Amino acid sequence: MAYSWDNRVDFVVRYMYDIDNNGFLDQKDFECMAVRACIIEGKGEFSPAKLAEYQHIMRSLWEEISDLADFDKDGRISTAEFKEAVQKTCIGKKYADFPQAMKAFIEANFKMIDIDNDGIIGAKEYRYNCITRIAIEDIQMVDDAFDKLLDDEDRRRGGLTLARYQELYGHFLGNTDETHPGVYLFGPLSLN
C-alpha cells in the first residue's frame, strides 16, 4: 500500500510541490520552489541568473499544471484535482510523453539532487534528498530503497544518470505497478 499509485501521487503533492504545507497547490508554492532550487543547486549561494532560470521553469510548470488540474479555476489545486490530471497526462505514458513543463521540473529536480554535479545521483546524494524530505528513523531503510531502485547498469555506474532518473520518474507517476523499481525513486514511502 505504501507504494500504491495513489500514495505516490500524494507524496509528490505533499513533499515536493506543497511547499507551504497548506494542503493544496497554488502559485506561491511554485515561486517558493524556484527559490529553493536556486539555493540548493548553488549550495547556499544565491545567483540572480539561476533564480530567473528557475522562476521561468516553475512559472511554466504552474501554468501547465493549473491548466491541466485546476478544474474549478479557483487558483488552487487539491490533491484530488492533481491526481485526476496526472491520471489523464501520465498513466500509461513514457517520460517523453509527459507535459513539457513537468519534464523541465524533473530535470531541475535531478540537478538539485546531484549535489556534486557529476551527472550521477549516488547513494550519498539519494540519502541526503530523502532525509531532507521525509522523516527517517533508520538510514538502512533509505539504503535498501536505493538498492531496490538500481539495476545492474546503475550499480556499475555508481547511481542514476539523468536519463535513468527520467525513466524512473516516468514510472513513479505513470505506472500503477507497485513492484516496479521506480516506486523507490524518493526513498521509503510511508502511508499518509
Named regions from a protein language model:
Residues 61-192:
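EF-hand and EF-hand-like Ca2+-sensor regions
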Residues 2-60, 70:
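Eukaryote-specific detector of the first structured module of a protein
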